[in-house]
Swiss-Prot record:
Protein name: Large ribosomal subunit protein uL4
UniProt-annotated stretches for the region Disordered: 46-78
Function: One of the primary rRNA binding proteins, this protein initially binds near the 5'-end of the 23S rRNA. It is important during the early stages of 50S assembly. It makes multiple contacts with different domains of the 23S rRNA in the assembled 50S subunit and ribosome. Forms part of the polypeptide exit tunnel.
Organism: Burkholderia lata (strain ATCC 17760 / DSM 23089 / LMG 22485 / NCIMB 9086 / R18194 / 383)
Gene Ontology BP term (one): translation
Sequence ranges of Basic residues compositional bias: 58-70
Amino acid sequence: MELKLLNENGQEGAVVNASDVVFGRDYNEALIHQVVVAYQANARQGNRAQKDREQVKHTTKKPWRQKGTGRARAGMSSSPLWRGGGRIFPNSPEENFSHKVNKKMHRAGLCSIFSQLAREGRLSVVEDIILEAPKTKLLAEKFKTMGLDSVLIITDTVDENLYLASRNLPHVAIVEPRYADPLSLIYFKKVLVTKAAVAQIEELLS
């Protein structure tokens, strides 16, 4: 698979030969959906809680006598049928939202995403991205020259100047190949990969 190599002005020059195993795989929408859903589910925290009838504040006194009032029977005010009563199946912070995806499926899903990005022209390769100083303005000007506004940068090692300069830019993220997640790959409009990172991605996924 041939990937576009961009210069500092964002213009296409030479091409980089990449592995077809990683960047030339068929598009598998069902697998990508499964991998993304699992990633989102595993990121969830148990941050919601409701009370059952044991936990709500109530009295155990019987509201009215069993017979003779014409009303429906009632034992105590904590009944789930009553306003202010406990829930029958309450949400709990201990709820487990995790989804398991086999390693082979996860790798295949990432390969399918990388391949589709390459086919759509959203994936490009650069020699390297170097900043002389950790200035957001310098990086913003570089992206403007290259015509980028929403970009995920995958680099072999995260340069400190590059990381500090990118923190205040919206829709910009910088990761190493091992931390590239399926949701970010789909979310950003463009994915820039350094030449050294391409080799690392092939090593991780092939």
